[in-house]
Structures are given as structure tokens and as C-alpha cells.
């Protein structure tokens, strides 16, 4: 259940809960979801958002759409001769149905193949700036979807949880996401929002991630859990087990299993039993998507600016203002 109403306006339609303010006392140990840290030093923390998108779903359903479209065209050709009077109306609307099929197939395939392999977020604690690598996408698959970088002042950001839920025919599923909200200074009027972490079945890891970011920006990496850089190599084995990592028979799977709590074992086992028929094909689609997806390329000036230390703050501020 949502906890009342958000303090921020306008409220997001999927809003669930406002999280503690940036400078509020910590009520939990700060930690990140395993594998979500790309890099961290005394100046910059780079957080991966690769796990937020369920890559492979568009490939799987896109290929099914293509197969269905081919079947539809073949069936239309078979019934053209001889042409019966009661087939005139279905044949008249068949071009529209075919066009819709092409649009859906292209949209699903492009969504998976064009979005970069990651959309990282950099927190620069010395400049108190947040750099968000974004890729715009929409409903027109034939239009170019640009990649942009948004820059926010840390002191204008707050956090909130969003929730989406529904019934998939077999089970009731809910997913939570952590969003950062930029407000006008001294107000709760929202200027912009961006998703920091998403696609989580529970809230605990998102609370921990917000605590981790707050601690890093105020105190640096000292005292924070240190994680190895996220594995970024693309292999068929890693993609195949992307959504059921605990079943991976290699060392990576053993590491995942070693960190799982009893409740996570129960939850993951239920998901595996109910959805393996979808998640393994999605893993194959994930491999195809990651092979074709563009790599992350920060604009050179933003890349340098987001890594700069305190001696460059004036120069960075001048560049942003200009």
C-alpha cells in the first residue's frame, strides 16, 4: 500500500513512497546490489543501470511477431484464390493488420537492439553533480532515438520509490524502482526525474542503494562496502543465465547463491518454476541484444568533467554555465 501522498508535485502515477532526505540520519547499513558498481574512487561513483532493463524480451517477442506476420501473409495468399464474397472485408483490412504487425515487430526489436549496453549514472562528490547517461526511446521505431547526458545538482535531488503490479495469468507480480527527483531549490516542485535502479521484486535493496549513494556523497568511499567492478563481458553463458543467475553452474552462479538469503531462495525458486519457459528464451534474446547494442560512449568533455576533482570545480561550473 502506498504511504499517503508524495510531498513532491506533480506526483508520479506509479509513486509508492518518499525516501529519507539526503542529509537524514541513516536507518540501515548502506550497500549496493551486487554487481551494480562500475567504478568508485574518492571523486566519482559510477552506478550501472544494466539490470534495470529486461533485455531480450523485445528480441523474443519481436521474433514471434515476425513469425506471426509471415504466417499471416502466407494465409492471406492461400485464401486469395478463389476469392469468396465473405472474404472481401477481411482481405480489405489485411494491409492494416500487416502494417501493425510490422510496426510492433520493429518496435520490439529496435528497443532491445538500439539501447546501449548500459546507461550508467556518475555521482561526483567533489563537484556535487550527478551525470545521467540516458537513451531516449518512443513508439516510432523508424525514428532515431538519441543518447543524451543530463546533469543534476546533488543538492536538488531527493529519492522516491515507484511500484508497478499486475497479474500475468499465473501469478501476481510487482516490481519496485528507485527514482531520483530534481526539484526547484527550496521547493517540492519537480523539474525532472530519472530512474536509478529498477525491476526489483522487493524494496530492501533499493533502500540500501539510496543509503549507499547518500553516504558516498557526504563521506566518500571510506567505510562503505567495496565491490569489484561489474562484469561487462558479453558471453552466451552469462546471457543465458541472466535472469536465473543462481542456476549458473560456474563460479559466478556460486557467488550469487552464497549471497542469497532464505527468502531469496524461496522467491527465486518460485520464479524459476513458473517462468523458466520465458526467462531462458529471454536469456538467448539478451545475448543477441547485447551483441548488437552500442557500447557506452560518454561525450569527451562530459567524461572528463564527471571525473574531475575539486581543483577543477570553477572550470567545470564555467563550462556548464556557458
Segments and roles (model prediction):
Residues 129-130, 140-166:
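Phosphoinositide-dependent membrane-docking surfaces
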Residues 40, 213, 220-262:
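Juxtamembrane amphipathic/hinge helix adjacent to a transmembrane helix
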Amino acid at each position: 500500500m502506498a504511504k499517503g501522498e508524495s510531498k513532491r508535485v506533480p506526483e508520479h502515477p506509479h509513486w509508492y513512497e518518499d525516501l529519507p532526505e539526503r542529509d537524514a540520519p541513516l536507518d540501515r547499513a548502506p550497500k549496493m546490489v551486487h554487481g551494480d558498481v562500475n567504478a568508485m574512487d574518492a571523486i566519482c561513483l559510477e552506478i550501472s543501470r544494466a539490470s534495470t532493463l529486461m533485455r531480450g524480451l523485445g528480441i523474443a517477442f519481436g521474433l514471434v511477431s515476425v513469425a506471426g506476420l509471415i504466417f499471416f501473409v502466407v494465409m492471406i495468399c492461400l485464401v486469395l484464390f478463389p476469392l469468396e464474397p465473405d472474404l472481401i472485408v477481411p482481405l480489405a483490412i489485411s494491409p492494416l493488420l500487416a502494417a501493425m504487425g510490422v510496426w510492433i515487430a520493429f518496435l520490439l526489436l529496435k528497443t532491445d537492439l538500439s539501447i546501449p549496453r548500459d546507461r550508467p549514472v556518475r555521482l561526483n562528490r567533489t563537484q556535487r553533480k550527478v551525470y545521467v547517461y540516458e537513451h531516449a526511446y518512443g513508439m516510432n521505431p523508424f525514428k532515431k532515438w538519441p543518447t543524451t547526458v543530463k546533469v543534476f545538482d546533488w543538492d536538488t535531488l531527493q529519492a522516491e520509490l515507484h511500484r508497478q503490479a499486475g497479474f500475468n495469468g499465473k501469478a501476481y507480480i510487482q516490481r519496485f524502482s528507485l527514482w531520483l527527483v530534481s526539484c526547484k531549490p527550496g521547493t517540492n516542485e519537480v523539474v525532472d526525474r530519472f530512474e536509478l535502479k529498477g525491476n526489483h521484486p522487493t524494496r530492501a535493496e533499493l533502500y540500501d542503494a539510496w543509503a549507499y549513494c547518500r553516504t558516498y556523497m557526504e563521506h566518500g568511499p571510506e567505510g562503505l562496502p567495496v565491490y569489484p567492478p561489474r562484469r561487462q563481458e558479453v558471453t552466451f553463458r552469462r546471457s543465458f543465465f541472466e535472469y536465473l543467475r543462481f542456476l549458473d553452474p560456474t563460479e559466478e552462479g556460486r557467488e550469487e547463491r552464497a549471497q542469497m538469503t532464505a527468502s531469496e531462495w524461496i522467491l527465486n525458486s518460485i520464479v524459476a518454476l513458473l517462468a523458466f519457459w520465458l526467462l531462458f528464451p529471454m536469456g538467448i534474446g539478451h545475448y543477441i541484444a547485447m551483441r548488437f547494442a552500442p557500447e557506452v560512449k560518454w561525450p569527451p568533455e562530459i567524461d572528463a568533467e564527471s571525473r574531475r576533482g575539486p581543483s577543477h570545480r570553477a572550470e567545470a561550473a564555467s563550462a556548464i554555465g556557458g
